[in-house]
Regions:
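Glycine/tyrosine- and acidic-biased, solvent-exposed loop/turn segments at the edges of beta-strands
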Residues: 1-24
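Functionally critical loop-and-helix segments that line ligand-binding/catalytic clefts
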Residues: 17-41, 59-63, 193-251
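Substrate-binding cleft of extracellular glycoside hydrolase catalytic domains
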Residues: 25-46, 52-162, 168-170
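Surface-exposed, flexible loop/turn segments at secondary-structure boundaries
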Residues: 83, 112-114, 183, 208, ...
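Sec/Tat-exported extracytoplasmic proteins
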Residues: 14, 55, 79, 98-101, ...
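Catalytic domains of cell-wall/extracellular-matrix polysaccharide-remodeling enzymes
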Residues: 135-211
Length: 251
């Protein structure tokens, strides 16, 4: 039995994680929704030919080598939420991202208020999941109150499993789970099957890389991208170019 060797920093006998150095040779991506188009009463387009990551946000400390002017390798776009909400910009953004040569994936924002099979149907009806697309994503970010109201974590995980199973069956692609570090710490151990069988895309706005079976890390919600108005979530793939090529071809 080999204990996994964990590269990273320990402080007062607590494993903090690996402190990432941000450089241009890492694989970066963004995720977008209606929020990138609508600010108050104003509406904005995206200048697709201009897209570059130019700032990694100020919420957490980061070690950056050189200046931030990174190409974008992948883009996730929100299509649906719950069983009735649609992102009106999804189809246009999806087509534009593909036309500009980006690797594209689609995500669904999970609601604690509606049945999982209806949410899966909504996602499948209104989303593109093509063979050369990135795996679909289930974005799960309920509050503790919302989980309590729906009947607890047992109910939540059962509904998540239903959505994941239905979407995988229909698309032939195993979805990725988008969850926060807090969700991992509080709840994920109660669903060892999900922890073991699904890659996660984790939101953790700190210096240290999350210590889970991870595909992507959302490192800030307040990044800046040339060509997009306002703040943008910036993500980094968990690996370098070879691992990314392998990930893309195997999914």
């Amino acid at each position: 039995y080999h204990k996994q060797l964990r590269a990273g920093e320990w402080k007062n006998n607590v494993y903090k994680g690996e402190r990432l150095v941000y450089r241009s040779d890492r694989i970066y991506g963004i995720d977008i929704s209606k929020h990138q188009h609508v600010k108050g009463k104003k509406k904005y387009g995206i200048n697709w030919s201009k897209l570059r990551i130019v700032h990694l946000g100020n919420i957490s400390k980061k070690t950056i080598s050189g200046s931030v002017n990174y190409p974008i390798s992948f883009i996730y776009i929100k299509s649906t939420e719950g069983s009735s909400i649609l992102n009106p910009y999804y189809k246009k953004d999806y087509a534009a991202a593909k036309a500009h040569g980006y690797k594209v994936g689609t995500y669904h924002f999970f609601s604690t208020l509606t049945p999982a099979n209806k949410q899966a149907s909504q996602f499948l009806k209104h989303s593109f999941v093509r063979s050369n697309d990135l795996p679909p994503v289930l974005d799960v970010e309920p509050t503790h109150e919302q989980i309590k109201k729906m009947g607890g974590t047992g109910v939540l995980f059962a509904r998540m499993r239903t959505w994941l199973r239905l979407v995988e069956r229909a698309t032939g692609k195993k979805p990725i789970l988008y969850i926060s570090q807090t969700f991992v710490n509080r709840y994920l151990s109660q669903a060892p099957d999900l922890k073991k069988n699904y890659q996660v895309w984790i939101a953790r706005y700190g210096e240290y890389k999350p210590d889970v079976k991870m595909a992507y890390w959302q490192l800030c919600p307040d990044g800046k991208v040339a060509g997009i108005q306002g703040y943008v979530d910036i993500n980094v793939f968990n690996g370098y170019h070879d691992a990314y090529s392998q990930f893309v071809s195997s999914h």
